[in-house]
Amino acid sequence: MGASSPRSPEPVGPPAPGLPFCCGGSLLAVVVLLALPVAWGQCNAPEWLPFARPTNLTDEFEFPIGTYLNYECRPGYSGRPFSIICLKNSVWTGAKDRCRRKSCRNPPDPVNGMVHVIKGIQFGSQIKYSCTKGYRLIGSSSATCIISGDTVIWDNETPICDRIPCGLPPTITNGDFISTNRENFHYGSVVTYRCNPGSGGRKVFELVGEPSIYCTSNDDQVGIWSGPAPQCIIPNKCTPPNVENGILVSDNRSLFSLNEVVEFRCQPGFVMKGPRRVKCQALNKWEPELPSCSRVCQPPPDVLHAERTQRDKDNFSPGQEVFYSCEPGYDLRGAASMRCTPQGDWSPAAPTCEVKSCDDFMGQLLNGRVLFPVNLQLGAKVDFVCDEGFQLKGSSASYCVLAGMESLWNSSVPVCEQIFCPSPPVIPNGRHTGKPLEVFPFGKTVNYTCDPHPDRGTSFDLIGESTIRCTSDPQGNGVWSSPAPRCGILGHCQAPDHFLFAKLKTQTNASDFPIGTSLKYECRPEYYGRPFSITCLDNLVWSSPKDVCKRKSCKTPPDPVNGMVHVITDIQVGSRINYSCTTGHRLIGHSSAECILSGNAAHWSTKPPICQRIPCGLPPTIANGDFISTNRENFHYGSVVTYRCNPGSGGRKVFELVGEPSIYCTSNDDQVGIWSGPAPQCIIPNKCTPPNVENGILVSDNRSLFSLNEVVEFRCQPGFVMKGPRRVKCQALNKWEPELPSCSRVCQPPPDVLHAERTQRDKDNFSPGQEVFYSCEPGYDLRGAASMRCTPQGDWSPAAPTCEVKSCDDFMGQLLNGRVLFPVNLQLGAKVDFVCDEGFQLKGSSASYCVLAGMESLWNSSVPVCEQIFCPSPPVIPNGRHTGKPLEVFPFGKAVNYTCDPHPDRGTSFDLIGESTIRCTSDPQGNGVWSSPAPRCGILGHCQAPDHFLFAKLKTQTNASDFPIGTSLKYECRPEYYGRPFSITCLDNLVWSSPKDVCKRKSCKTPPDPVNGMVHVITDIQVGSRINYSCTTGHRLIGHSSAECILSGNTAHWSTKPPICQRIPCGLPPTIANGDFISTNRENFHYGSVVTYRCNLGSRGRKVFELVGEPSIYCTSNDDQVGIWSGPAPQCIIPNKCTPPNVENGILVSDNRSLFSLNEVVEFRCQPGFVMKGPRRVKCQALNKWEPELPSCSRVCQPPPEILHGEHTPSHQDNFSPGQEVFYSCEPGYDLRGAASLHCTPQGDWSPEAPRCAVKSCDDFLGQLPHGRVLFPLNLQLGAKVSFVCDEGFRLKGSSVSHCVLVGMRSLWNNSVPVCEHIFCPNPPAILNGRHTGTPSGDIPYGKEISYTCDPHPDRGMTFNLIGESTIRCTSDPHGNGVWSSPAPRCELSVRAGHCKTPEQFPFASPTIPINDFEFPVGTSLNYECRPGYFGKMFSISCLENLVWSSVEDNCRRKSCGPPPEPFNGMVHINTDTQFGSTVNYSCNEGFRLIGSPSTTCLVSGNNVTWDKKAPICEIISCEPPPTISNGDFYSNNRTSFHNGTVVTYQCHTGPDGEQLFELVGERSIYCTSKDDQVGVWSSPPPRCISTNKCTAPEVENAIRVPGNRSFFSLTEIIRFRCQPGFVMVGSHTVQCQTNGRWGPKLPHCSRVCQPPPEILHGEHTLSHQDNFSPGQEVFYSCEPSYDLRGAASLHCTPQGDWSPEAPRCTVKSCDDFLGQLPHGRVLLPLNLQLGAKVSFVCDEGFRLKGRSASHCVLAGMKALWNSSVPVCEQIFCPNPPAILNGRHTGTPFGDIPYGKEISYACDTHPDRGMTFNLIGESSIRCTSDPQGNGVWSSPAPRCELSVPAACPHPPKIQNGHYIGGHVSLYLPGMTISYICDPGYLLVGKGFIFCTDQGIWSQLDHYCKEVNCSFPLFMNGISKELEMKKVYHYGDYVTLKCEDGYTLEGSPWSQCQADDRWDPPLAKCTSRTHDALIVGTLSGTIFFILLIIFLSWIILKHRKGNNAHENPKEVAIHLHSQGGSSVHPRTLQTNEENSRVLP
């Protein structure tokens, strides 16, 4: 996409120095935009727009804030091009309605049809055509608006509606049809038939049928006639009748007359049904109804094991019947008869004879299901399956077997016991939601979370399933659904679980493995399969090795003959099978076998057994009778023998058969056969045989027979006692009444048992049957039977029990990362210790004791957790650093090294004071601490103030903060400690000496254990510690349960006295009517005392009452304080009687009697103010039970309390029944504190207390901000704000605040802790002709100063001045980016004139007068005023001497709009500030939607600033009314409005008496929420109320359900799924209806199979060898080196059979955008940035490249990087241009000439000399460069050559003078002639002339002036005699003489010279008084002058000699004056050889 950056709406800063304003702003905008993603964030790639496309495509995924993307409308849409902008909130501006779909023309209705516009006629829309009734559509029935070129058209032409045609109507005999058109017939055309008339128009034929038919259509395409045509027949005639399969016997004529009879017969193989003859009636009808001919039936089918009637017939007529009957032993299934049908078939289907079946199995399985077999025949099996969560206890099946002569079920219904799981595993560094003593039933879920560790700086991640569920293994034991997760640090997998089926190929001791590690496994010997490997995945879980190794199996075991095999689980190795025989057979051999491994094969451990029929011995013989049997020798199980008595003579009956006449062979142990009962007797009627009593003696005569009513008496043998009546009477049928007595031995007292009590201690003798009961003392378990019975043999049975000390079960817990230390035994008081490995700390109890809990011995604490010890982040030290990383975890043993920062720039060196290495260790409490304090970086010589000691204090307080080496500080122990005073000293290593173990904490005395109790020392017994007391089970604590070690004076003692442990007493046990209790002590009853009840006996010891209830109760306690009895006492009642039922607060409506008879019904009602729960009527059952369960009368509850900011459901009710619940919920933003539900108690109160709604609070903000501060609010409620502020020199990366916000139903901090990054500045800018003190190594830290200087160029003769600040400092801009404090200065060539350039434009101010100049002299002032949006006074800037404008900081400030209004229920987000140009954003609280603009900007309005938009409104999000459900309703406190957070609770309708009719399936409560913060939706679908034990029809996509046409299914019903073609099933094919309307197992799903994933160029994917992939399978792509993966790294096979997402591609690695800039040059970027790409650097003309000319994209490790940075473009300078003889150039003498500068040459002019020079060569040369970039001149310098003109004439003469030199013949240009004057004349002016190039002499401007010497008018002391003239001429002499008293000083004579002076100078006359002094002074002066003259003369001579040598070609022409006077010679010079440059 074309990404462009807009101009910032507000200027960010001045443009870069040296750039014009237009360019500087753009450059700065680019820089700002490049910085924005870091500072403010970025936008992701915008969504694909269906109506528009980007003008330029790009592969970018992220775009900086402020980026523009340009779009144009797609074909089919109209609109202008537009742009979207990435806003500061990282959201793209909207593009809605920018492009509108083009419209096709309005489609016309087809004739006789219409067009249906579905959704408009715009691009992409579709229209439909239809025809009016009777017309058919010719053409396309629809059209779509599509693109065609630049417009849109309909893709199909308008169709035609053609009238539906019909063919010709059918013709009829003797008639015709009438129609308006006889050729064309269309839809709706009607034709009417009529019969042809006879001659004369008479009616001959009758029209029979519909007279009119019409043209219609069934498919709107083809026309058909509405019915058959009528017929025209002669009246009273009939057409021939037609009988299918029949033959007309009569003549077959075309017509039959009225009343004519015809006859039929059927074709062969058919029989007739109906009349053979029919008669012709009026209107062509035959009567009676025509017959039918039906086929004859063949003989019916034979049925196995059945007979049928009429076996002798071969043919059967329709309607004939046959009857079936089965053989004996079989039941007839189906109809007993079949009938022959007219079609020749038998109906109904033939029956079958099936083996007899058992009756329906009537047993019910509570909490389970009974699975019935297909049939109930012999051998049929009924299976018992428990519901999910229950395990089977008992037989899993019942078989239909033959028992005697009957078929019965061989076992009863088992029991389904609820499954419970052990306590969920404890995990290190984590916790679960289970409670310590909680019970975990099947289905219970437990959630795991990891502990936060802000003190360690460590965050743990939960690896594995966060939720585990209590489920079961195949054996029905409770197990957790998956292993407990673990809390670990991401990046490694723990060691994998041990596999039962496989083992590692190579063993390893590693405990963790990096992601991607693979471990190779091979199957164990009991399994088979290929080797495989598992891999540590990215989610830190090992890949699954399911179904890799399969368990070897044995062969399917055969059923033994007359037996069966029971496969318990399967037939794999290790499994066991059981054998059993059918009833009546015994098992010979092994009853079980195990599948074992032998070598590599699996086989059964034993051979199958044999089932042998159980034999019986001969049946008993009887006197006077015999038995009858089919076989009198062999008798087996089931054989029946029948007895009969011998008849008398003549066959008369003599004996009576007394007893069962038949007995059968059976078995009690399935091994030995016995007869079912004693044989009967054959006795004489009304006689009895002698009665037999074992160990008894018949006192009466012992005869062989006794008469009716005769009485006999018994007594027992010595040593035996009688039980029962002594006398019995002979009754009819040889019976004695009452029942015969028994004689049993007498028992001695039973044995005493140690630590036990027994009942009936006061008795010496015990009758047989008498029982004694044993009970153990508390803390002991009874081993053996609890009671002993006196046997008839005089012994006690069974053996006496023993009382053993109670023991706890084996301690099964494992301690990960620790050890469990076991005791010698596990008896009460035993202790298991837990010790953690080094580096781990114990979380939980350090020991578990075996204690007595109630009557059980249990371990009092579960396994603790050994959590790894972590240390907090090591302390940060000023001026130093450590080797720890910012987010590193510091486990036990980790070492950290400290070093001090080097500060060479500061001139400071710090030394590390203290230990340089500290190690993570632990304190006595197991907390992670560092081995020593962190060192410090300081300047040597002083210790810092010592740490505060908990155990000691300074003797003398001091405020000093540092102390010199050697300082000692004195300490004394604090009151809680004891020890001598001590001192610490500041050592040479600047650390204080250690005061270890100087003061020790005072301790209390060791507390004694109370009797029957124990003391628990929590930590120690030192001052401040606490101990707890507890009593052993059965004792209560009297006194204080804890004590603290406190200080009193100087002594430590316990705060309270030890308590007393008193045995818990119980009151007297309850008394019962008609019974009493037995106990060793009937007065005192304590915890553990057991009493046993028994009922009183009637007269003679007979049993009168039945004991109903628990016979024994024991003393226990619920609160360890008050003793109570374990349950109610039993009752002694008369059998089949009930005591009056008692209902609290209930009234018995029936008569209140003491006893009620069996099945008697009583009725209750409740007292006023109470409501009944349960049945009103109950019935007396056996054992004193009333059924159904008694009702209860409970108080009515008033409405529950209302709570602020909360509501409860139901809320509309006035009265609440006991047990009813109400549910509380809070408004959004509030948390419920307390119980969520209250229930109405039977006392009429609500329990527990009502909750309250508190404003939601976020958890403590635990994040730390290194190099910054976290500013906390006053509270942590919703809306609270935590601010983050970085220290100076650091910038915030991330959000500057974190708000406590509502997310869903939780309150969370919306941002995590940001990072404070060190601010760095880029390398300081390089300047031309200058340098800085910065290093080239990289970024410069905040605060660093850089100095600039200009380069010296003495070789160039140039000097540069530094313009700007010479020092810049690394500081930061408002966004935290590192910037330099001011622009870099520049080095400008020093020039005399000083000007400032045009000042930069200020964003905040404008000049009062427009600026048009480009340069301003030093001192110029410009006046400015603030722009709109800013305020401040007018100010001015001045051009300073350093050619920089004066500073303008803080002159104008942005105006403020003030705080923006905060919307109610929302908040304002101030991004930067509220000043002009700033933007603030609005957001609404959770549950509210924003109406209005989400942002507003502070803009100019008039002379002020204001927010451009009003604050939006936060409107609460509402939901539609919650969905209604069948058979149920919802409760809510408001049924009209449903706002966000509103909770509604559903419940199902109940029956009239409150009984449950429906089951609520699904979430009981749903709440109003929102997915887009705009529209309210309900959190989930509502639950359903379905019939109890019913399931709704499950739906599986792409599957077919069998059966599929029902909406409800019954409990345990099974349905099957199969997938549609092309789909595969994942999951179970069958599911079963479970309770709660659920299907189990989980519903399957049908997914398409995926083909292999696509191959990609330069890449590969995993699982490349696989052909088919199941849904959910993943493949992972990777690229070859040098290629990057673009797209998703993994694809997964979707249920639709596709791969998702799209396959990635491998693109050549690319370098990042090359962001470097090249001042004075260009960066040439390549077409792409892939590896090998080259960025070239080209300097602008006049600059040369210093550095590399290109940077290549190269591979460095795994990253693509540019291999060189940006070079520098230096300005090119040329050396000074060459000088030329007789010429000059325009260059300056100041130094180098810049590139491009042109220099012009010209030849010197010499008009005075008369010479002219010509320029030979280029007159201009330009500074350019050679290929190496050096400055060179464009061409060589030119030269000046003399032009040769005409010679000059003879030189002119002058007055009083002449030229010297001889006369020459030719005077050439350039020749010089010198002139001299005659003696007495002096030359004035130039003394020469020269010949010019024009051939004339230069101007003669000299002359000869006469020489005159002046004489002073007055001379002191001169002789007056002398006559002096005023003027003397050249050559004149004067002589001087002085007057007396004067002395002549000087020469007495002097001559007038040619230069108008006297030589020697005129003398003076001086007074003689000063002669000596004057003479001395003059002499010295003269000598000094002469010396100087002499030296000067020597030097001059030397120079002249040199000049003579330098000019050997000079010609001197001496022209002497005529007078012979000495004159200075003049020289005539020539330039004939151009050897000298003229002056």
Swiss-Prot record:
Disulphides: 43-86, 73-99, 104-145, 131-161, 166-215, 195-232, 238-280, 266-293, 297-340, 326-353, 358-400, 386-416, 421-470, 450-487, 493-536, 523-549, 554-595, 581-611, 616-665, 645-682, 688-730, 716-743, 747-790, 776-803, 808-850, 836-866, 871-920, 900-937, 943-986, 973-999, 1004-1045, 1031-1061, 1066-1115, 1095-1132, 1138-1180, 1166-1193, 1197-1240, 1226-1253, 1258-1300, 1286-1316, 1321-1370, 1350-1387, 1396-1439, 1426-1452, 1457-1498, 1484-1514, 1519-1568, 1548-1585, 1591-1633, 1619-1646, 1650-1693, 1679-1706, 1711-1753, 1739-1769, 1774-1823, 1803-1840, 1848-1891, 1877-1904, 1909-1952, 1938-1965
Q: Which UniProt keywords apply?
A: Blood group antigen, Complement pathway, Disulfide bond, Glycoprotein, Host cell receptor for virus entry, Host-virus interaction, Immunity, Innate immunity, Membrane, Pyrrolidone carboxylic acid, Receptor, Repeat, Signal, Sushi, Transmembrane, Transmembrane helix
Instruction: Provide GO CC annotations from the record.
Output: cell surface; cytoskeleton; extracellular exosome; extracellular space; ficolin-1-rich granule membrane; plasma membrane; plasma membrane raft; secretory granule membrane
Could you say which residues form the signal peptide?
A: 1-41
Give yes or no: UniProt keyword Signal: yes
Could you tell me the Gene Ontology terms of the biological process aspect for this record?
A: ATP export; complement activation, alternative pathway; complement activation, classical pathway; complement receptor mediated signaling pathway; immune complex clearance by erythrocytes; negative regulation of activation of membrane attack complex; negative regulation of complement activation; negative regulation of complement activation, alternative pathway
Which ranges of this chain reside in the Extracellular compartment per its record?
42-1971
Question: What residue spans carry the region label Disordered?
Answer: 2017-2039
Subunit: Interacts (via Sushi 1 and Sushi 2 domains) with complement factor C4b. Interacts (via Sushi 8 and Sushi 9 domains) with complement factor C3b. Interacts (via Sushi 24 and Sushi 25 domains) with MBL2. Interacts with FCN2. Interacts (via Sushi 24 and Sushi 25 domains) with C1QA. Interacts with CR2. (Microbial infection) Interacts with Epstein-Barr virus gp350.
| UniProt family annotation | Belongs to the receptors of complement activation (RCA) family.
Please report the name of this protein according to its UniProt entry.
Complement receptor type 1
Give the source species. Answer: Homo sapiens
Q: Which gene encodes it?
A: CR1
